[in-house]
Design a protein with these regions (language model features):
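Residue-level recognition of alpha-helical structural elements
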Residues: 18, 48-52, 109, 138-142, ...
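Acidic/His metal-coordination segments adjacent to aromatic residues that form catalytic metal sites
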Residues: 3-23, 86-119, 187
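Conserved alpha-helical segments that form or flank metal/cofactor-binding pockets of metalloenzymes
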Residues: 54-97
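Leu/Val/Ala/Ile-rich N-terminal alpha-helices, chiefly Sec-type signal peptides and the beginnings
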Residues: 1-47
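Preference for long, well-ordered alpha-helical segments
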Residues: 123-197
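Helix-loop segments that flank and shape redox-cofactor active sites
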Residues: 31-58, 125-142
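Generic structural signal for well-ordered, non-transmembrane alpha-helical segments
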Residues: 23-30, 57, 61-68, 114-125, ...
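Heptad-repeat amphipathic alpha-helical coiled-coil interaction surface used
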Residues: 26, 33, 37-40, 60, ...
Length: 197
């Protein structure tokens, strides 16, 4: 489908495009909330990974709150069901499946490594790319969440790497899940939905 005349190279989003992005961000943060929450409360020996459980519980709380902030920014319009906008993005392919595999892992250390080394940096890249082309006039409230999410995400990556470095001294977890996420995200560093038009 060609672009309408006069829209070539436009740097703005329609309300429908922005709504789809915010819905995808909400879905993404909800999935992170669910996965990290499951690690924090899942079965297994508590003493062996107590510090990791505390860290994943904090991550779950942060991403749950972020999902709530995205949900607050979904448009309220006649004929548009806001909850229906919360859906997995079309790209990258395999994202929903990668989250299912991440959630199904029985080894919290393996999952946390994939989360810290691949998922969080990718999410930060998506948010950063959106910020680069966002317009304050029409996306001011969205930009505020993006800025906060990137700042907190960077701190979360640093604390996660520090924790995993201390915990993995006893034994290096396999990279299987990290590789899965890298394959899911490799073709495109940023979700194609971030780019307008």
């Amino acid at each position: 489908v060609g672009e309408p005349a006069g829209d070539e190279g436009r740097a703005w989003r329609t309300i429908d495009e922005l709504a789809a992005l915010v819905g995808a961000y909400c879905w993404l943060e909800q999935r992170i909330f669910e996965v990290t929450g499951a690690w924090a409360t899942g079965p297994g020996p508590v003493d062996e990974v107590a510090e990791l459980r505390v860290w994943t519980a904090a991550a779950s709380r942060r991403h749950g709150a972020l999902a709530g902030r995205w949900a607050e920014r979904l448009p309220v319009r006649a004929g548009v069901e806001a909850a229906a906008l919360v859906a997995a993005p079309e790209g990258p392919r395999g994202l929903a499946e990668a989250f299912e595999e991440l959630e199904a892992t029985k080894e919290p250390m393996v999952g946390a490594c994939a989360f810290v080394e691949t998922v969080l940096p990718w999410v930060g890249g998506v948010y950063g790319s959106h910020l680069e082309i966002a317009t304050p006039v029409s996306e001011g409230s969205v930009m505020a969440v993006l800025v906060e999410a990137r700042r907190e995400g960077s701190a979360e990556i640093r604390s996660g790497r520090s924790l995993l470095g201390r915990l993995s001294e006893a034994g290096k977890p396999s990279g299987h899940l990290g590789d899965q996420f890298k394959r899911a995200f490799a073709p495109e560093r940023v979700s194609p939905a971030v780019r307008p038009g």
